[in-house]
Each structure stands twice: as C-alpha cells, then as structure tokens.
Amino acid sequence: MNKQRIVTTLLLAIGSSSCLYGVMFTMLDDYRNNFGIAESALGFIVGVGFFTSFIGQVSIAPLADRGRAKRLIVLGLTLEVIGCIGMALGQTFVVLLVSRTVMGFGAGTALPALRRVIIVADPENFGRNLGRILSFEVAGFATGPVVSVVIADFFGIPGPFIFLAGIISCFILIISRIAVPETAKEHQPTERFAIDLLKNRAIASGILIGVSLFFMIGVFDSLWVLMMDDLDAAQWMANIGVSVFALPLVVL
C-alpha cells in the first residue's frame, strides 16, 4: 500500500474513533430517560474517559515513537471497540463508567500512534497532514450525531455503538495487515513519558490552548442534549445542534 493510501486509511480510522464521542454525547438523554441515571453521574461518565485518555497519552502512547506504533494502534482501537460494546449494552452507572474508562484509555493509546504514523509516512506534507488530522477528528465528531439520529430510531441505544464498533473493527483488520512505517531508530526519543515534554514552555502553552478548547466542547456537548430534551425539542434538532457546533472547526 502506497503512503497516500496509508495516510487516508489512518485518517478515516481517526474520524471513526472521534465519531464515538459525537454518538456518546447525543445519547446522554436516552441513558437518563431509559435507565434513570442522574445528570451528575452522566457527566462523571463522560469526564472520566477524558482523564483515562490523558493517562494513556502520557504513559503508553510514547511507545509509538519507539517503533511500536502499529501495536499501539491495534491495541487502542480494540479497547475502543470493547468500550463501545459496553456503552451499547450497559444499563447501569457502573457498567457505563467502566466502558467509558476503557474507551477513553483506548483512544489515548491509539490516536497519538495514528498521528505519529501519518507524520512518518508523509513527512513532505507535515503541515498539511496536521491540519487534515484535526479536520478528520472534528468531522468524525460532527458525524456522530447524524449516525445517532439515523440508526437509534431503528435499533435503539445499542444501534449507533454497535455500528461504530463494526466500522472500527474493520480498520483494526486493515491496519493489522499493512506495513505501517515506524520511527527510525536514530530518531527515537530518550524520554520515557510524554509528560516530560511539559518542561518545554512552548509545548505546555499549546497544550493549555487545546485543554481550553476541549473544556468548552465537553461542557457544551454534555449539557446541550439534556437541555434540549428538557425543552421537548425534537431528537434530530438536538443532534444536529452538536454537529453544527463542531463544523466551523473543520473549515478553520
């Protein structure tokens, strides 16, 4: 497989992974109404996944720079599939919490490795690919509510999660069979954990900007669907609102 096809495949895998978040946010009102889970508990379920994702990024993800990117991608995406199935079948706070924890850790393991391989596979287009990575992440997130509103009407809460678990499983099979370019040994870093990079003020500043962006997204999306449900708005209107909120990020 040539490098352009590898990059495209990995970008689509990133988009599918991000789509999970769009689906999850738009199903919060269904969890509340069908299973009686409190809003505060739902907020905790959503938030814990971001924390476990961070743990995965600073602990295991740096191994992608040491020639293990492919293994991390397969491992991370597999954990996402497991968490996704748990979110589909779970009906209690504990089950959903564990599933979200696994899903978040999987994302924190796979996504940095996916980004790393894209950069290594096509170094001549480094800047363009960085922009494309963000665009596919946001586009995947914005597609999630559309997937929810179309599939959940026919198959209920499990439908969108099972659908995405199947899509991500296909990417696991594809990626496990292709030759993924790894970081050359002479370019592998000496730092053991990614948190060591925070000593660099420029990197720390960029991370804080990213934190503020995703803090805004997390607050808005976790409240939007619940608020629209309380206002008796149509389900499609609540879901499309999440997509419209994210679309400008794709263009910009």
Task: Give, region by region, the residue ranges found by the protein language model.
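Juxtamembrane intracellular "pre-TM" segments in multi-pass secondary transporters
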Residues: M1-K3, V180-G206
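Helix-loop boundary and gating motifs at the non-cytosolic
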Residues: Q4-G43, I217-M228
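Cytoplasmic helix-loop-helix junction between adjacent transmembrane helices
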Residues: T101-E137
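Extracytoplasmic gate region of multi-pass secondary transporters
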Residues: F25-T26, A204-G241
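C-terminal membrane-cytosol helix-exit motif in multi-pass small-molecule transporters
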Residues: G166-K185
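Paired small-residue
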Residues: G83, V94-V102
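Residue-level signature of mid-helix packing/kink "hotspots" within the transmembrane helices
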Residues: F50-V58, F141-A142, A246-V250
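Conserved MFS/SLC helix-loop-helix module at the cytosolic interface between two early adjacent transmembrane helices
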Residues: I55-A88
